[in-house]
Swiss-Prot record:
Gene3D superfamilies: 2.60.40.790
Top-level taxon of origin: Bacteria
Organism: Bacillus subtilis (strain 168)
Gene expressing this chain: yocM
UniProt cross-references to InterPro entries, sorted A to Z: A-crystallin/Hsp20_dom, HSP20-like_chaperone
SUPFAM superfamilies in the record: HSP20-like chaperones
Gene Ontology CC annotations of this record: cytoplasm
Residues of the sHSP domain: 51-158
Name the record gives this protein: Salt stress-responsive protein YocM
Localisation: Cytoplasm
Role according to the record: Part of the cellular protein quality control system with a specific role in salt stress response. May facilitate protein homeostasis, together with chemical chaperones that accumulate during the salt stress response. Increased levels of YocM protects against both heat and salt stress. In vitro, displays an unusual aggregase chaperone activity.
Family, as annotated: Belongs to the small heat shock protein (HSP20) family.
Induction per the UniProt record: Induced upon salt stress conditions.
Length: 158
């Protein structure tokens, strides 16, 4: 069986019948235990061919201390120049793009993340302090100082 032709047929079927095509083909009870490890059991569900990508990518840890909040965003294979951070007050947007150096038809197996991504990170009200970012070893560290503001005296009325 020619894998490339099968892949093209599957992509065509998904485009014609929408993103839920494979969910309609396979029953929920047909999933085996090894298919329920956090990944979708349906072919191509993690990489939408229309450019939306995997909503869970990139994975992220959040560390909340007394003075700051640190976001650790895991971007294996990405370089600093592939990634951009935008601050919109109530949220951050981390986006990037990475391309393969190989021709698509030369892949026998392809599990790496290629193409573009965008992750929106909501921020709580007290996160409006100084921000800085470091990219090291495929991990983007974004640190935001907590801004608790100045204490205000509240007068107690009689």
């Amino acid at each position: 069986m020619d894998f490339e032709k099968m892949k093209q047929w599957m992509e065509f079927a998904q485009q014609m019948y929408g993103g839920d095509f494979w969910k309609q083909v396979f029953d929920e009870d047909q999933k085996t235990p090894f298919m329920t490890n956090g990944q979708s059991p349906f072919p191509f569900a993690q990489q939408d061919q229309r450019g939306k990508g995997d909503a869970s990518f990139p994975s992220m840890d959040i560390v909340d201390t007394v003075a700051e909040v640190q976001f650790l965003i895991y971007l294996p294979g990405y370089r600093k120049q592939d990634v951009h951070i935008l601050s919109y007050g109530d949220y951050l947007v981390v986006k990037g793009q990475r391309f393969s150096y190989f021709n698509e038809q030369d892949f026998r197996q392809k599990e790496g993340k290629y193409g573009s991504f965008e992750k929106k990170i909501p921020l709580s009200d007290h996160l409006h302090g100084k921000m800085n970012a470091i990219f090291k070893d495929g991990i983007l560290y974004i640190t935001i100082q907590k801004d608790e503001g100045q204490a205000k005296t509240i007068v107690i009325d009689d």
